Amino acid sequence: MDRYQALFAQLEKKNQGAFVPFVTIGDPNPELSYNIMETLIEAGADALELGIPFSDPLADGPTIQGANIRALDSKTTPAICFELIAKIRSKYPETPIGLLVYANLVFANGIDDFYAKCQQAGVDSVLIADVPTNESQEFRESAIEHGIHPIFIAPPSASPETLETVAKLGGGYTYLLSRAGVTGAETKAGMPVAQLLERLNQYDAPPAILGFGISEPAQVEEAVKAGAAGAISGSATVKLIEQHQANPEALLKALTDFTSSMKAATQK
């Protein structure tokens, strides 16, 4: 049983969903970034989703672009990122670690080299934000060869065919993209998410974790109620780093409070 399977089985027993925060490695600097990842896990994060800083993050909003800039300014390189992941992995042998990256970064030293480094550092999954399923073969084959789950996005507008492909090709978990989480009053996860989940289950997809615009406990609760296996929170986590970057103590306290309240909301 791999780390994701073990996690979902454990959460099912406890009747909980997964809370997965996203941060960019090296934001605001490599040393503090390690403390941040440690703090997130200690405060209740079930898994981590991590970005490797990149100068042109297409799919990211301004908050995560800011994280990339801070990390690059503090001289964070992919090599430093893999070192930090390996350090977290040795301290937390059971916590699933996923990467969210862009194809250019994977191509930089060759696809195989990238996945070999992931394997060595103890990464469990890789989501390449700008590679759709129909262009994923080369990445997927290398990932699987190195024991890494390829993660795919199921967008709200996906056709049944797309969902079936995502279900068939993905492993670890399915990243369910929800536009349902952007504004307060209208975020009732409602039909679209429930329908998508139903479809994904029909196709026997890996457990679906809802991401995009998840910033408060009520949304996590909604995601889990709608049948998602958990929720990913990126911008909201990164915003706390942005706000408190000058004061590490306040920063780690804010992340602890945020993570524990989001995790508490995963109880069914």
UniProtKB/Swiss-Prot annotation:
Subunit structure: Tetramer of two alpha and two beta chains.
Key word Lyase present: yes
Enzymatic reactions: (1S,2R)-1-C-(indol-3-yl)glycerol 3-phosphate + L-serine = D-glyceraldehyde 3-phosphate + L-tryptophan + H2O
Purpose: The alpha subunit is responsible for the aldol cleavage of indoleglycerol phosphate to indole and glyceraldehyde 3-phosphate.
UniProt name for this protein: Tryptophan synthase alpha chain
UniProt EC number: 4.2.1.20
CDD domains in alphabetical order: Tryptophan_synthase_alpha
Organism: Aliivibrio fischeri (strain MJ11)
